Amino acid sequence: MTAAENVCYTLINVPMDSEPPSEISLKNDLEKGDVKSKTEALKKVIIMILNGEKLPGLLMTIIRFVLPLQDHTIKKLLLVFWEIVPKTTPDGRLLHEMILVCDAYRKDLQHPNEFIRGSTLRFLCKLKEAELLEPLMPAIRACLEHRHSYVRRNAVLAIYTIYRNFEHLIPDAPELIHDFLVNEKDASCKRNAFMMLIHADQDRALDYLSTCIDQVQTFGDILQLVIVELIYKVCHANPSERARFIRCIYNLLQSSSPAVKYEAAGTLVTLSSAPTAIKAAAQCYIDLIIKESDNNVKLIVLDRLIELKEHPAHERVLQDLVMDILRVLSTPDLEVRKKTLQLALDLVSSRNVEELVIVLKKEVIKTNNVSEHEDTDKYRQLLVRTLHSCSVRFPDMAANVIPVLMEFLSDNNEAAAADVLEFVREAIQRFDNLRMLIVEKMLEVFHAIKSVKIYRGALWILGEYCSTKEDIQSVMTEIRRSLGEIPIVESEIKKEAGELKPEEEITVGPVQKLVTEMGTYATQSALSSSRPTKKEEDRPPLRGFLLDGDFFVAASLATTLTKIALRYVALVQEKKKQNSFVAEAMLLMATILHLGKSSLPKKPITDDDVDRISLCLKVLSECSPLMNDIFNKECRQSLSHMLSAKLEEEKLSQKKESEKRNVTVQPDDPISFMQLTAKNEMNCKEDQFQLSLLAAMGNTQRKEAADPLASKLNKVTQLTGFSDPVYAEAYVHVNQYDIVLDVLVVNQTSDTLQNCTLELATLGDLKLVEKPSPLTLAPHDFANIKANVKVASTENGIIFGNIVYDVSGAASDRNCVVLSDIHIDIMDYIQPATCTDAEFRQMWAEFEWENKVTVNTNMVDLNDYLQHILKSTNMKCLTPEKALSGYCGFMAANLYARSIFGEDALANVSIEKPIHQGPDAAVTGHIRIRAKSQGMALSLGDKINLSQKKTSI
């Protein structure tokens, strides 16, 4: 056992720089010194005994000269001294001197000072000698009637401990404490007494509870918590008692203490699965979330609500509470809001979706009135996505949502506007009846759009879905308005010339000489340098984008103009109008090409954009039926296929999720005939109090996989060889932020090994909590040594060290056995996670650490290799299965995972199979890993390389 596992009541720091005092000097100070000297001497004695010194000669001195003193500090120190001093002879008999000490205990138990009485009673809880306790029993009983509650509650604790360890000393303890409990008024005393009855005589505790079950609401919160625990344990052991106590739990839901309400709600859910019980518990959880200010508490209680939702029967009850759950959105914390919106979205039904949409619309409008903040922007995105999902699931709601969301297309926050655009694109494709409304609203906000990315998307939607002659003309009008005066080059040159004239007449301040790219001189005044800012602000949006050198939007505009021109030709029969419209579209494209070739834009037009615009010009000049089909039919079909694939993917993931949630009973499962209780009823559940205690102690028992190979033996690491004098192997147990090394050490020699010490050191973000204690191993004996290691981040860590020992009777130096390195597997800390494509791209751009891993494998199938990487790295593939299906010789996929420390890990797999090398050619390519920290990126890269080596063998 390690030092941390031994029972220890007192920890005292030992100064290493001072010399230990002699027994004679201590004896002199204890006999003849003043109170201060005796106090210091007593402290030194305590430290020496803790260090292993016996000091038997000082026991009588302390009894004679220190024990009679009434100083409170000395009395406190004496309690520590009597706790640690050896009280028995080597053969186990009580020392005669302890009779005198026992008399001192009795006097302290009758002391007029309540603190001395109470602290003495607490000290008696630690005594393990029945001979010392027996004479004190009358005094301990008398303390139950003391006027002060501090004495009474410690007397209850003392009686409970003595009854548990030495029942014969006080056989009537349960009856005594029951009588005490009936007449007691103090909350802490009642709590201690009731707790003792729960563990010592549960029937008496239940009898007492039955007599006062109607007054439970008036009890203090500490007693109420114990009552909840008792009811849970009783009903867990005996489900037939549920009807007897369920009303009490209902009453405790109205307690003034949040802790009691939380525990009562959790217990009620386990006691009953009736809709009224689930509704009451859920309502209690919601009230707690709203009223508690601590965000951690809110998140914990939200998790309990989410757990309730996982049960199919409970989910139907929670659906009626969606509007109550939405009250949690008043919390400013983003994580709480995110979980709340997801929960509401999972629970929403056709009955309450209208109310949900109304609340979300109000929340969206509220975000407009709040000063711009990063969390406000993110919250707006969450609201947009939630409304998007509602509209897809409930198409009738889309008409109410669209007008509110369309206003956000002109928002400064590009991410929120992009989410709105994605929603609008899906809505206009899915809902034919809303196309007119969407086009109308899009035209209203088109001129106010500030982001070029949103502008491109809006252009595409307008070009694809304006189907009437009036809409087409409106789109052309908006484009002309957004482009400004044409031809652009001539109008810009005229504007420059027009603006320079008045400036020439004004005498301006200092004129600065500048050298142009051509090597000539140019002048620039303070006035002329400040003018462009105002001029740029006055530019129409599309013109501004083009002059800034963003010609990608011009390529998108050319496609839009081509689509609407071809559609206009099909709708209007008059040749003159057809030619006029097509000519106008071609003029706009030509003027943009001219601008791109000129020196006016900040960046010249790219060859790709020139090719695209030229192609559109050619299509309009020829107007062939084939091109008409490609532009007006094939594009829309591509979007339809993409949305169908996305919807199918979502349905598939939901189906998998529901299959996980559904608890199926196998045909060969044993049947519980008693009341034909279902498998998920309480008598088959684990004790929640016991589970939480185990979790707090780090002893959480994880469920092993069905595969027999996935046992603890898989994690045993051999540290030394079988031929070494000391054989060692370790089991690495990972428990969230801790690693426990359980090391088996075997003495393989015929000698006794003394001071056998396991010396460990760490590499990486690991920290050894304590140094394992040395031990002695008999010939061919073995022992287990435990060592705790703290983990701070997801990074490959290495634990290394050696075992040193002395051979009994040998005069040689210490012997040393070097241990093999223990590599900590980061897969224990990485969990698959999901994020949107936009979030993935944003993180990809932000993360500064990249690790590029070259593919080196014998595998010949692209999909098999991807599955191998997913299994090796514990990451989730974000790329839809449909996009990965089929065979084309290459594959690209995005992977994502998150560590338990909140670190994100991204990976992009880009692999191909060289076709010219035949069907047996190995997969080639590379994997790029990005993370915020260097350790995460390197660790994942190492993991992939290691997995590749295994496949290459």
From Swiss-Prot:
One of its GO terms (cellular component) is Golgi apparatus. SUPFAM superfamilies: ARM repeat. Proteolytically cleaved between Ser-528 and Ser-529 by CAPN8. HEAT repeats lie at residues 96-131, 132-168, 240-276, 277-314, 316-353, 396-433. The modification N-acetylthreonine is found at residue 2. InterPro entries: ARM-like (IPR011989), ARM-type_fold (IPR016024), Clathrin/coatomer_adapt-like_N (IPR002553), Coatomer_bsu_C (IPR011710), COPB1 (IPR016460), COPB1_appendage_platform_dom (IPR029446). It is a peripheral membrane protein. Keywords: Acetylation, Cataract, Cell membrane, Cytoplasm, Cytoplasmic vesicle, Disease variant, ER-Golgi transport, Golgi apparatus, Host-virus interaction, Intellectual disability, Membrane, Protein transport, Repeat, Transport. The keyword Cell membrane applies. GO terms for molecular function: structural molecule activity. It is found in: Cytoplasm; Golgi apparatus membrane; Cytoplasmic vesicle, COPI-coated vesicle membrane; Cell membrane. It is linked to Baralle-Macken syndrome: An autosomal recessive disorder characterized by global developmental delay, impaired intellectual development, poor or absent speech, and difficulty walking or inability to walk. Affected individuals have early-onset cataracts. Additional variable features are microcephaly, facial dysmorphism, metabolic abnormalities, spasticity, and lymphopenia. Brefeldin A induces dissociation from the Golgi of the beta-COP and presumably the other coatomer subunits. This is Coatomer subunit beta. It comes from Homo sapiens.
